[in-house]
Every structure is written in structure tokens, then in C-alpha cells.
Regions:
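Short, structured helix-loop element that forms part of the nucleotide-activated donor/catalytic region
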Residues: 12-18, 205-231, 319
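Carbohydrate-associated surface elements
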Residues: 124, 146
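A short helix/loop element that forms part of the nucleotide-sugar donor recognition site in Leloir-type
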Residues: 153-166, 221-223, 343
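A short, well-ordered alpha-helix in the C-terminal region of glycosyltransferases
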Residues: 159, 305, 312, 319-334, ...
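A conserved mid-protein helix/loop that constitutes part of the nucleotide-sugar donor-binding site
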Residues: 171, 175-197, 204, 304
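Active-site donor-binding acidic/aromatic loop of nucleotide-activated sugar
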Residues: 213-218, 231-240, 246, 296-297
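Short hydrophobic beta-strand element within catalytic cores of glycosyltransferases
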Residues: 276-279, 289
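Conserved acidic donor-binding segment of nucleotide-sugar-dependent glycosyltransferases
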Residues: 291-292, 296-304, 312-318
């Protein structure tokens, strides 16, 4: 089984695919993003869709493709090429999209009629798309993402504490995620205010840069930090490439998303690093965090109640250690990379034509 991969631009992924033997082609794939949700944007996407359709169709014929695999609902052209050539189509679904309603309905229709199987990254994602169009016989299967737990927790601790001049007496509570309305940076700051009033030694670290077009949110976040008098208490590190090193020094990891996050891999990375996790109770988080065993699930719209849930973890180091150990065991048992690979390969094999 050989793979030809189409990517929309040059970047580190090209080298990663080539390293494992895949052939890579750079093709503008008419990726559907929120910034194109306008009459002009839809015209732009339609033009690039037709170009991508032509290029991909030519490529599929040249390599005698047996199957098309699309790795996001934001790329529609793979489904069209597969349909036009009579090829099986596997669609990997990472998104929970509620609005615009017309887009959600169109994507739901496409999933029903333009793929042999959809692979949802979580049961929450599967439920969302199954419920979007009431019809029996779902084509969607759930396959959890996997990570190599052995790559986490091996970094030397102390790097972050040294960088921020924090002692072992400081409790580091951190979040990692790109800046966006629903990623919860502002909610994290409000939680920080509640916790810091009771535990002055707590420090709060935010890691992650902004999605393109959302850089203006930095102003809102830092204005809130100032208004709550948390300068020096909440520390924004921006983009970092050394996430495993940072996680090692976190005492508590927080996922404060205010909208359902399909399956946030960073939660698995924190658990693999033996960190207790606090996550808002919706989306894929509820399938990753076992409430009261590997961490706590909190509301996404009530920082007072969230603080009352989190406080025992802030207060009790032994509880944090117990949750962290249980979290790592859960990652190794349920979210292993080897299991993920095996399930994906099996699905693809099921839909490849049998050799004659």
C-alpha cells in the first residue's frame, strides 16, 4: 500500500511525509475557513475548488488511485474527486460545526452521500454529525487519536520555573491552546483571579499564539489581566515549540474551552506527562478525563462553581499526584498510538479493492 499526499502549502509536514516514504504534491485545496463565509469568499472558494478538482483528478488518474482519504471536513474536493471517479472515500472528521446552519446541513448531507465511512475523533463528534440529519444507518465510526506516551514526561523539570524565576513553592497552573474566542483564554484568566485570591503562590501560564485573523484578541485578554490586577500572576508565553518541557513543570493542566473541543490532543499530552487535568465538561474532554479519577470536569460558564471544584486539587499535592498517575495509565491503555494506527489501517484496507 503506497500513499500520495496532497498538502496546500510547503512546510514541516512535507518532510515528515517524505521521511516515511509518501509522495507529496502541493495543491491549493480550497480549504473552507470561517473567513470565507461571505458572498465574495464563497466565490473565491468556488474558483479554487474547480482548480483543485481538476488538479486532483489528473493526479488520481496518473497514480491509478484506489481510494481517496480526506483529513478534515474543511476540504470538500476529495469527496468530489472520489465521486466523479467512482473511488471509495474515507473522511476523517475533526470538527464540531453548529453554525452557520446551512453549512452544517451541507456537510452533514455530504457525509451521508459522499463517503463510504467517516472517522470521528470522538464520540462527541460522531453524535453531533449523526444528529444533524436524522436518518438510520450511520456511516461514521469513532477512532480516538493516539499519542506515544513515552515521548512525554522524559524532559528535565525545572526549565519553566527557572525561566520565570519561580520556586518550588509556587503552584503552576497552565493552559496550552491557540488564541480564539472559544478556546477559553479569558475564562482561564477569570479562574486565575478566583484561585489567586485564595492561593497567592499560584501562577498561571498561557501558551499558544493566535489563529490568523484573531490577533486582536490579545488586547482583550491582556486588558482583562490588567483589570483583575493579575500582571505577573498570569503569564502569556505565546507560541512555544518546547511544549513537553513546559508540561513537565505544570502542577495542573487546564483546558478551559467555552465551546465543545472535538478531541484536544494536548489533554492527552498532559495526561501522558502525569499531570492532573481540569477540563470544561463538553466535547471530547469528557471522553478523556475521568472525573474524580484523572482530574476534574468543570462548567464552561461559571468560574465560581469551577473554582469550588478545582480547589481541592490546588490545595492537595497528593491528590494531584494520584490524578496524574491515573491519567498516564489511561493514556497508555486507551489512547496508544499503536492502537490508533491499527484501527485506521484496518478501515482503509476494508475499503480498498481486493486484488485480482
Amino acid at each position: 500500500m503506497s500513499c500520495t499526499v496532497c498538502l496546500p502549502e510547503e512546510g514541516p509536514l512535507v518532510r515528515e511525509f517524505e521521511r516515511v516514504g509518501a509522495r507529496v504534491h502541493i495543491i491549493e485545496l480550497a480549504i473552507l475557513r470561517k473567513k470565507y463565509y461571505s458572498p465574495y469568499g464563497l466565490l473565491d472558494r468556488s474558483y479554487h475548488f474547480l482548480k483543485a478538482f481538476h488538479s486532483l483528478s489528473q493526479l488520481a488518474r496518473a497514480i491509478h488511485a484506489d481510494l481517496v482519504y480526506s483529513n478534515t471536513l474543511a476540504v470538500l474536493v476529495g469527496a468530489a474527486v472520489a465521486r466523479s471517479m467512482g473511488l471509495p472515500h474515507v473522511w476523517h472528521i475533526h470538527e464540531i460545526i453548529s453554525k452557520p446552519v446551512l453549512l452544517r446541513r451541507f456537510l452533514s448531507w455530504s457525509l451521508r452521500r459522499r463517503c463510504e465511512v467517516g472517522i470521528a475523533v470522538s464520540a462527541a463528534v460522531k453524535r453531533h454529525w449523526d444528529s444533524s440529519e436524522a436518518r438510520s444507518g450511520s456511516v461514521i465510526r469513532t477512532v480516538y487519536n493516539g499519542i506515544d506516551a513515552d515521548k512525554f514526561g522524559i524532559a528535565q523539570s525545572g526549565k519553566l520555573r527557572s525561566e520565570l524565576a519561580l520556586s518550588q513553592d509556587h503552584i503552576i497552573i497552565g493552559m496550552i491552546g491557540r488564541v480564539h474566542y472559544w478556546k477559553g483564554q479569558e475564562y482561564f484568566v477569570k479562574l486565575a483571579s478566583q484561585i489567586h485570591k485564595r492561593y497567592p503562590s499560584a501562577r498561571f501560564v498561557m501558551v499558544g499564539d493566535a489563529f490568523p485573523g484573531y490577533e486582536h484578541l490579545y488586547g482583550r485578554i491582556h486588558a482583562l489581566i490588567s483589570a483583575l490586577e493579575l500582571e505577573g500572576v498570569v503569564i502569556d508565553l505565546g507560541f512555544r515549540s518546547d511544549v513537553p518541557d513546559l508540561l513537565v513543570d505544570f502542577d495542573i493542566f487546564v483546558l478551559p474551552s467555552t465551546a465543545p473541543d472535538p478531541l484536544p490532543t494536548v489533554v492527552l499530552e498532559a495526561m501522558a506527562t502525569s499531570k492532573p487535568v481540569v477540563a470544561t465538561a463538553h466535547g471530547g474532554s469528557v471522553e478523556m478525563v475521568v472525573d474524580g479519577i484523572t482530574g476534574f470536569l468543570i462548567p464552561w460558564d461559571d468560574e465560581d462553581k469551577a473554582f469550588s471544584i478545582i480547589e481541592p486539587m490546588v490545595r492537595d499535592k497528593e491528590l494531584r499526584t494520584r490524578f496524574g498517575s491515573a491519567g498516564r495509565e489511561r493514556v497508555v491503555r486507551t489512547f496508544a498510538l499503536s492502537r490508533y494506527h491499527a484501527e485506521i489501517v484496518e478501515i482503509v484496507k476494508q475499503h480498498l479493492p481486493r486484488p485480482t
